[in-house]
């Protein structure tokens, strides 16, 4: 019975891995916006997926991205922080390919950051790198944001962006803490 319950719990957790929208926090690092009470950028959704992308959870990624798109009507770019994706199978590849088609056909761009060597080898072997575009795959989220942010924001839109300045969510008002121009580090998230 214990082994069966453990297996069931493992399968459930594998089907719904941790996934979070990230935003800049007071330590100049990207953290889970919900947990840290941070506002997210309305134009760029920085999404971290923590787990292998395989048959048991690929539809979950697709559902979550669809939900993010629905809840962010001004969304222009999705950055999938991939440090936590340690493996990908054929279902995961197919989901990623379809996801790229869907978001780009809706006028939203998609990039990856922090892709590990194992996953990158699979993406290259299956020609997904060509579909994504090498210029849309970054070594870490900070390098990605430096490239994406300027292209995605127009003029005044960048002034109080939660990816450049710490912006807390509050029930009454938004409290903004202007730091420097965002993350200084090239460390991964």
State each model region's role.
Residues 15-189:
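Cytosolic C-terminal regulatory domains/tails of membrane transporters and channels
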Residues 1-22:
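Flexible hinge motifs at transmembrane-helix junctions and intramembrane kinks/re-entrant loops
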């Amino acid at each position: 019975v214990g082994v069966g319950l453990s297996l069931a719990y493992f399968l459930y957790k594998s089907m719904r891995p941790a996934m979070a929208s990230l935003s800049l926090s007071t330590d100049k690092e990207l953290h889970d916006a919900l947990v840290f009470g941070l506002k997210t950028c309305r134009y760029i959704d920085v999404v971290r997926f923590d787990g292998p992308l395989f048959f048991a959870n690929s539809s979950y990624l697709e559902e979550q991205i669809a939900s993010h798109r629905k809840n962010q009507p001004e969304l222009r770019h999705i950055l999938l922080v991939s440090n936590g994706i340690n493996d990908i199978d054929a279902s995961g590849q197919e989901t990623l390919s379809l996801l790229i088609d869907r978001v780009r056909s809706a006028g939203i761009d998609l990039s990856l950051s922090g892709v590990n060597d194992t996953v990158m080898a699979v993406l290259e072997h299956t020609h997904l790198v060509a579909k994504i575009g090498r210029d849309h795959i970054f070594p870490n989220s900070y390098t990605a944001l430096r490239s994406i942010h300027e292209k995605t924001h127009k003029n005044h839109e960048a002034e109080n962006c939660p990816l450049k300045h710490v912006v807390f969510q509050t029930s009454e008002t938004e409290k903004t803490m202007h730091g420097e121009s965002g993350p200084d580090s090239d460390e991964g998230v």
